[in-house]
């Protein structure tokens, strides 16, 4: 989430951002750190309206949001499109002016798709100690298949810097335990 060119997003017409919290902005359960606070300050300077959309409860969300001061929706039950639509309404924008940023294909990105909102999948932020859940394996399989599909041939990689790195990481995955973000180069950092 920290490597995205937000000025470019603003220049092409986006005015609102819906953020996931855990593993997108900070490791799971962590409070907002200096990087997160700086990011939100920069987004405000650029003119973005920002809202947090999370499956976390009120106390966790409020704790993260203490120094950020963003709007938020907690207990969202993603990928249900209703909270995404509510977030757009709270921002006071149209869907084509809003983009979702999250780390989970089956929650954040699928929810955005279900609500007809653009999205960016970012690299999972983790401490490296937790092993992947089943949905991370499914994400890996889908991103692997992306490389052989017609849209990849048409559109190219999604944030790829080195074409062969995907296959190199796949070989490493077979030999060692790795987090999803270490496997897939198809995400922002």
Outline where the language-model segments fall:
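Asp-based, Mg2+/Mn2+-dependent phosphohydrolase catalytic module
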Residues: 1-19, 25-31, 37-100, 104-189
């Amino acid at each position: 989430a920290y490597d995205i060119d937000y000025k470019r997003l603003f220049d092409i017409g986006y005015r609102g951002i819906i953020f996931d919290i855990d593993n997108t902005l900070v490791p799971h359960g962590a409070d907002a750190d200096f990087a997160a606070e700086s990011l939100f300050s920069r987004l405000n300077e650029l003119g973005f309206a920002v809202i947090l959309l999370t499956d976390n409860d009120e106390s966790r969300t409020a704790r993260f949001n203490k120094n950020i001061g963003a709007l938020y929706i907690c207990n969202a039950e993603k990928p249900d499109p209703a909270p995404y639509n509510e977030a757009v309404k709270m921002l006071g924008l149209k869907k084509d002016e809003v983009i979702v940023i999250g780390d989970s294909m089956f929650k954040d990105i699928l929810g955005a798709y279900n609500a007809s909102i653009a999205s960016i999948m970012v690299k999972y932020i983790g401490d490296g100690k937790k092993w992947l859940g089943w949905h991370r394996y499914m994400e890996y399989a889908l991103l692997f298949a992306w490389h052989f599909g017609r849209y990849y041939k048409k559109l190219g990689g999604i944030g790829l810097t080195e074409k062969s790195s995907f296959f190199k990481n796949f070989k490493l995955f077979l030999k060692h335990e790795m987090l999803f973000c270490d496997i897939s180069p198809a995400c922002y950092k």
